[in-house]
Structures are given as structure tokens and as C-alpha cells.
Amino acid sequence: MKVLAAMSGGVDSAVAAARAVDMGHDVVGVHLALSRSASGKRGCCTPRDAQDAAQAAQTIGIPFYVWDFSEEFQEKVIDNFISEYSAGRTPNPCLRCNEHIKFSSLLRRALALGFDAVCTGHYARVFLDEDGTYQLHRASSWAKDQSYVLAVLQQAQLKHCYFPLGATPSKKLVRQEADERGLKVSKKPDSHDVCFIPSSNTGAWLSQRIGRRDGDIIDDLGQRVGSHTGAFAYTVGQRKGLRLSSPAWDGKPRYVLDIEPISNTVVVGPRESLRVDELSGAFTTTGWCFTSRPIECSVQVRAHSDPVSAIAFIRDDVLVVRPDEPVFAVAKGQSAAIYRGTRVLGQLMIDNTKKYASS
């Protein structure tokens, strides 16, 4: 099989590429240049990352190239990130990058050049079932599982995905293997921040691009309790950094409950008001057919949160998910991954949330 190995400059993608070679595949390494800026200390898009990827490819013994996807990344990921926050929503840029860059723009170019698959260092697994359907599953190591950010992938993409690390028990073993292979990235730290925000200060980064927008912070009773310089700097569930002018009447901590972009208002209130009993919105499927008939499943609303048992069904052309127990601090714009066991059924883009009246 002819494999294009996407090499970020980190240890996971380097070991994945090496394993692809070990399996006898014809492997070519490629680094995605996603930004023309030289800023940033950690991530996957700096010149240092490109150098690390090139060095790893040389050690493995495979050809290596750098492909420029900066324009697509700007439009599909960065501009989307800014517009979503401006609209009071909370996007996941890693998920958007997988959807539009790694497994769209990159995959299309790879297929056009005669490659059979794109190999990445993601911790997930793909199986071909008896019906010819490609199933996306969690990694063997749930601690490192990344199926949440891959839940947007569909059959045409999964058919060409190759995840050599999916069955690896732990990241420690990956680092150990990298060291044994002589890969200098074996001790390179993991990146947990948004790669295109060097300072890790999302609010300040957004403010530079959107501009200052003074507005009010109100409580759930409609009383003004503070002010802000940009509602885009807040997200649902946030507690720190609110700088409220008056304490809550009940003495309880207050959290961001909602962001109203039209009035440029941030609404705060008690944690119990963050409860969500129903999620709904547009969806994609990895190959599962959702219908109006409810199915038992589990839902995961964040990359590293625990899944919650739920039912899912179609209503008025949108996917509705009702967790068996409430989930908290779910923001519009977030994604929810839908599972049955370890299998990913699809992804819900959360457009609406609902809280049922207490019994």
C-alpha cells in the first residue's frame, strides 16, 4: 500500500510513520505548513516542528516534503474559530482541522497523487466489517483515545485512514519505541494548546482580531453585575476571570450560563443552571443510519470527558440526544461524539440545548 504519512513534528506521527514502514508499505512523509508565522513554542505548525518532522523522516529513511495548506487552514480553521466565538459559540479547532485539512484537503491531494491512505499519529482504530462498512472505534488506550476529534469523518474518508497507534496500550510505550528507533522527538512534550494561539490566551488573541466590544454582565435575574470588553472572551461554564461587581444573593459561585452576541451580553448564574438534559443540531455519520426511532448509545461532549449513556434519534431533520443523566456546561458550537460501545456512530454539532423542568 502506498501511504502518505502526515508528520506534525511530534513523537506520535513519527512512530506511526515508522510502523507503516515496518508493515511493508511504501511510505512518504509530509509536513503540513499551516501558518507562515514563526511564532509559537508548542503546537504542530511552527518552523521548528517542520525541522523535527524532517529529521524524523530522515531517521526512518523515507522521502519527506512540506506542503503549504496555510490558506485553507486560515479559511477553514482560523477564520471559523473567530466567527464562531464572535457568534457566542465555542468551536473545536482540532476537529475542524481534521474535517477540512488533514482528511479533506490533504487526503484529496494524496489520492490524486496515487496514494492509498493517509497515515497519522491519532489514537483511534478503523475496522472493515462484513457489510463493507468502515467502522471508527476508540483506541485501545482510552486515556489517549482521540476518536472524539475524528467523529466528523465519513465513509469516503475512513476508507483511506491509517492509524498505526490505535492498539498501543500507552503513550509511554510510544515514547520508549521512539527512543529505541533513535527518533530525537521521543522526549518532545505533547501539545495541548490551540496551535495557532502562541500565548495560549484565547481572549487576548481574539480581542486583537475582533476588537474591543464593551458590554454588560447580567445575572439570571436580569440584574447587571459587571462589565466586559468582549463577550467573545467568555465561554459557557467559565467561572474564573469574571470580575463581578457584586456577590451573588445566595453566596454561591457564579458561572457563565450564556453569551448573547446580538446584545453583547454575558449571562451568569449558579452551577445548577448549567444543567443540560437534551442536545440537538446538525450531524454527520461515520456510516451509521440514524432514524426517528431512538437508539441506545453514549454521548461525549468534550475531548477528554467521560461518555454518558443516552438515546439518540432524528427529529425535524436534526439529531436529538438525551443523556440518561444531565451534562453540564455544554456550549453551542461544541461537538458531541455519539458511540455504541467503542464504535463511533457520528458527530453532533450542538446548536441547541434544553433543560427539563425539575420534578
Curated annotation (Swiss-Prot):
Record keywords: ATP-binding, Cytoplasm, Disulfide bond, Nucleotide-binding, RNA-binding, Transferase, tRNA processing, tRNA-binding
Organism per entry: Tropheryma whipplei (strain TW08/27) (Whipple's bacillus)
Chief localization: cytoplasm
Active site (record annotation): C97, C195
UniProt-annotated location(s): Cytoplasm
A GO term, aspect molecular function: tRNA binding
Annotated spans, Interaction with tRNA: 144-146
Domain of life, per lineage: Bacteria
Pfam families: tRNA_Me_trans, tRNA_Me_trans_C, tRNA_Me_trans_M
Annotated S-S bridges: C97-C195
Site (Interaction with tRNA): H122, Q334
GO cellular component term, pick one: cytoplasm
Function: Catalyzes the 2-thiolation of uridine at the wobble position (U34) of tRNA, leading to the formation of s(2)U34.
GO biological process annotation, one example: tRNA wobble position uridine thiolation
Binding site for ATP: A6, M7, S8, G9, G10, V11, D12, S13, L32, G121
UniProt xrefs under CDD domains: MnmA_TRMU-like
Record carries keyword Nucleotidyltransferase: no
Enzyme Commission designation: 2.8.1.13
Keyword tRNA-binding on entry: yes
Catalytic activities: S-sulfanyl-L-cysteinyl-[protein] + uridine(34) in tRNA + AH2 + ATP = 2-thiouridine(34) in tRNA + L-cysteinyl-[protein] + A + AMP + diphosphate + H(+)
Name of the featured protein: tRNA-specific 2-thiouridylase MnmA
Name of the top EC class for this enzyme: transferase
Family: Belongs to the MnmA/TRMU family.
